[in-house]
């Protein structure tokens, strides 16, 4: 079950961050600028910022199995819609406008109730004493499946035409992304235990109360950690531009640059995450 949850977490975030591996295909197929590609992620970030808190509140009242299935199904539909946008070869402004809407809506799939539902599902699988082990297995499965999915996406890009037929290759790469979120939806429907809403209800002391917001905002540690995360994520986001550097300056192919991106983003994380936990 934890491996399936890892597949869900590893697959749903591939699409909104696809430019980390497929930077040049995204730019060239949509006929957009570097700034416009950045705005896609900005739309996604805005949606996530707005939705995380209400999503967490709603997750307290929602069965995690239903929430995960709905989130993954919506992600599959939106990823498929983007693939169709590529296939239709729409005018640049139209295709880009549709893409902005898709990136905003994908926040509903991955940033609304999904993340909290994943945490809730992991929590109910094991006992209180097993939580550390449960999360460790989940994150290992998450990183491993994300690396495998990204590699399959890159294979689909090459099989579909690669740099010689970038539109076709990019289309099949996006289709493969949708296939994995669909697979995760089916596996969760089959294997994740669907406990009753009564069994999954959150204890009163653990539920969200608006008065807690004031308490949290008064805590200096919260602001300090927020600044740290902001800085770290800023560096992480900027690392996406290492991919076009490899293709434009170093003159690597999209495939070779994609392999470097997968190594940087997923494989290194598999080593760095547990090492960081030890340190």
PLM segments and residue spans:
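Flexible cytoplasmic inter-helical loops of multi-pass small-molecule transporters
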Residues: 189-211
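Hydrophobic core of transmembrane alpha-helices in multi-pass small-molecule transporters
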Residues: 78, 94-113, 230
């Amino acid at each position: 079950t934890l491996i399936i949850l890892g597949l869900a977490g590893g697959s749903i975030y591939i699409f909104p961050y696809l430019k980390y591996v497929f930077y040049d295909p995204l730019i060239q197929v949509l006929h957009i600028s570097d700034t416009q590609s950045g705005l896609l992620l900005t739309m996604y970030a805005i949606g996530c910022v707005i939705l995380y808190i209400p999503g967490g509140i709603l997750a307290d009242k929602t069965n995690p199995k239903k929430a995960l299935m709905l989130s993954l199904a919506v992600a599959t539909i939106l990823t498929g819609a983007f693939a169709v946008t590529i296939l239709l070869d729409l005018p640049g402004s139209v295709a880009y406008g549709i893409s902005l809407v898709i990136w905003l809506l994908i926040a509903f799939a991955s940033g609304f109730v999904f993340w909290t539902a994943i945490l809730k599902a992991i929590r109910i699988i094991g006992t209180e004493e097993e939580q550390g082990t449960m999360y460790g297995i989940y994150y290992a499965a998450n990183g491993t499946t994300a690396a495998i999915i990204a590699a399959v996406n890159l294979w689909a890009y090459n099989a579909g035409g690669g740099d010689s037929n970038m539109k076709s290759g990019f289309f099949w790469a996006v289709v493969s992304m949708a296939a994995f979120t669909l697979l995760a939806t089916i596996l969760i429907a089959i294997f994740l235990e669907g406990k009753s809403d009564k069994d999954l209800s959150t204890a009163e002391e653990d539920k969200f109360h608006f008065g807690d917001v004031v308490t949290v905002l008064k805590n200096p540690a919260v602001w300090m950690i927020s600044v740290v995360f902001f800085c770290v994520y800023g560096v992480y986001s900027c690392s996406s531009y290492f991919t076009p550097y490899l293709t434009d300056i170093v003159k690597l192919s999209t495939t070779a640059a994609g392999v470097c991106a997968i190594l940087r983003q997923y494989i290194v994380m598999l080593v760095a995450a547990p090492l960081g936990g030890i340190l």
